[in-house]
């Protein structure tokens, strides 16, 4: 495996030259105009060209705070909706974690540097799940689900993103800090659905817990398995859940009676479902599991219509990233390889090796930015965090 990783790293250095030999945008456009390429083939080849031309760039991390993240290992990164910031979880040498926000506004070609804003250190508490939350405005908060310890029960905390801004820029942005006592959560999701406005869901052991931030009211739905992945639909009144048993089911948010009628859709994988992603039209759902299967499901016909081969997972909780604008699917495997597929035909476009030897402790965390730095007109790009390093793979 190590020899394969080194071979791919060597090939990566030559990618730009290789990709341009007889395989460029102008020749593909000409073939399409002459009818030699249909729309599907043209789209796939265009994506393959852009993805194959992505070059790894080391990002310089600068700090506005003396307690810099630069010396701490990255555990997880999560891009905001507008791709202008990353929420990061870092492992520190003493027991506990650091949480912070990295501003991506300075991440531009050819200068690749970012700024770490203020950090918060939480000793002896581990986050089981997290997501962005839109309470006052888009991505105004981060929802963190902490596991319980001896003198502190498990809870869900809505942390204002403004808490991470410097003192000078935090004026008139107090934000609201909320805490809710809940059982330990495997997963969480924030709702933008009008049927569950200002609500979040927590996937628990054999239960889904829906909580209203405004009133504190909680509604539970009993399940037969641990809920490892969740996502609310934006328009349909549904909350999709992926379970350890391999079942994917939707909760109809219009049903107040927990006893019957709330289970709207049922799909099945052969292993624990670790990620669910609803596509924009809400007619399809993509899911990945602990056997490395990635499937695209037609929600109307309740059947699998496409599989994406090559992903490696045996026991890890690994997210799936779907980006419809670019027509790609991204996933990091337990073997530490980042793979990119064409969303439309499941063709494997690229396999990116980790800069470090494969290890359970060094699985990269990735995020895809539709506009690097959140700047209008900026190129999309892939961000990768591994150990203490942050890398960027901008689209050409």
From Swiss-Prot:
Localization in the cell: Cytoplasm
Pfam family for this entry, one: Beta-prop_DCAF4
WD repeats: from-to residues: 268-307, 312-351
InterPro entries in alphabetical order: CUL4-DDB1_E3_ligase_receptor, WD40/YVTN_repeat-like_dom_sf, WD40_repeat_dom_sf, WD40_rpt
Keywords: Cytoplasm, Repeat, WD repeat
GO cellular component: Cul4-RING E3 ubiquitin ligase complex; cytoplasm
Keyword Cytoplasm: yes
SMART domains per UniProt: WD40 (SM00320)
Domain of life: Eukaryota
Entry annotated with the keyword Repeat: yes
Name of the featured protein: DDB1- and CUL4-associated factor 4-like protein 1
Species this protein is from: Homo sapiens
Gene from which this protein is expressed: DCAF4L1
